[in-house]
Amino acid sequence: MASSNLLLEVQFLHIPSLSQKQANPLSCRKFSSLDWKQEIGLKKDVFFRCHGLLSSVCIDNVNDHAERSSEFHHYGVGTNLRARVKPMKQFGLSSDGPITENDEETNNEILHNLCSNGKLTDACKLVEVMARHNQVPHFPSCSNLVRGLARIDQLDKAMCILRVMVMSGGVPDTITYNMIIGNLCKKGHIRTALVLLEDMSLSGSPPDVITYNTVIRCMFDYGNAEQAIRFWKDQLQNGCPPFMITYTVLVELVCRYCGSARAIEVLEDMAVEGCYPDIVTYNSLVNYNCRRGNLEEVASVIQHILSHGLELNTVTYNTLLHSLCSHEYWDEVEEILNIMYQTSYCPTVITYNILINGLCKARLLSRAIDFFYQMLEQKCLPDIVTYNTVLGAMSKEGMVDDAIELLGLLKNTCCPPGLITYNSVIDGLAKKGLMKKALELYHQMLDAGIFPDDITRRSLIYGFCRANLVEEAGQVLKETSNRGNGIRGSTYRLVIQGLCKKKEIEMAIEVVEIMLTGGCKPDETIYTAIVKGVEEMGMGSEAVQLQKKLKQWKLLKEV
């Protein structure tokens, strides 16, 4: 549609099956949903006097002849109801037909069955017929119909049925309204959504947190930050409860789109309206700025928190520590920790994990281990994340003996080692060429019922190749293939080239076969390495013959 105003209009056209004599003379009039505010307060008898206006609502312009020509009793209507429905020929719901002879209860039972069977177009037609003949449609069925139409993106029909429901005295629930408002916001029809939001309160179904959050997010998505701020301020002035979740969402979005300074201004403005921020609201600002490294903005927010008599909590401290560790501001980290010890918010296991992880990433393993022991002194039990971080860092730094010792202690704690734990230590041992210890740990892992993954096997294979134990690497590849596990092509290449260098051509060819059966296509370098290995074994004629075969099979290019 050309604009959001056009969306607000519902065209009332002649129903295709009606003759000119049957059609209501007012049926071509347009009726805007902007007029809802005047209509919602009308009594039901006034609504019934308006039936001429609703006489020929064209709910569906889609070519759905099959659906329109269906009979009501085909949609699961009970035997008693069929008896009450007058006998009829094949007819469409776009015509009143004998339906006018049905009472309200009968038509509502038909409406319920149509909605239950997903016949939304027929249900829309029936609601229109009932409205034209002063029959009040079943409100729960209308709500379900509106939701169904909203799900299939038929907003014009959904809003039309919603209007009929409201003018009949029904009160749609908040979920129904929210579905329509959500779809309107997705399409960028903010004005229409705001009109519908205002109508919610007038109809006795006030907006909730989801309603407000949806509208505010939509405004920001379309670059209307100031409109969103004014909107929430107006809602507070009109008596809307100061929903803290909505307030937090608003402030975080203002911070994201307009900066911290504007967000703090909004905090001050909303406080005048009786909406006061809590530490959760402030934490959203701290978190946003920390993630972007805006430490000056963070300092400004912290100062604002303290100046208003609020205390930082554990979430605030942990967020600050995570940011400071990532920037390697270790003096500031120590300062924050000292403050935490002096308050009621002592460091938790999450706090220590942040510190240990940051120090390990900065390759300050000794300080990380100091914090690990400090953690134990404070009676703060490490979890598996703590152990995995320390063991991973030890293995990378070559402290494999210490890692094995810590791993042994871990078995007797409430945090038994897992796959990640074993992989870290096995990889460290393999990189140092300590394959005997790596294999021992590998078998311990299997005995504990922990199955290796591609990382485990790749660490072993690379370790064997570095230690010039290519045959053992080939055996691991065979075991992997027998279990149906995948291996990277680079791993196969490393083993094949290592076998060729050691003139283990038969085993190299066997690994190639494993590679092919595993669905991994070798490249030309692998075949070249095999030919070269055969030649170096003193079998020149065999190498030439093999090369010809490979070229014939188009596995090697002609030079």
Swiss-Prot record:
The keyword Repeat applies. Keywords: Repeat. The keyword Acetylation does not apply. InterPro entries: Pentatricopeptide_rpt, TPR-like_helical_dom_sf. PPR repeats lie at residues 103-137, 138-172, 173-207, 208-242, 243-277, 278-312, 313-347, 348-382, 383-417, 418-452, 453-487, 488-522, 523-557. Belongs to the PPR family. P subfamily. This is Pentatricopeptide repeat-containing protein At1g08610. It comes from Arabidopsis thaliana.
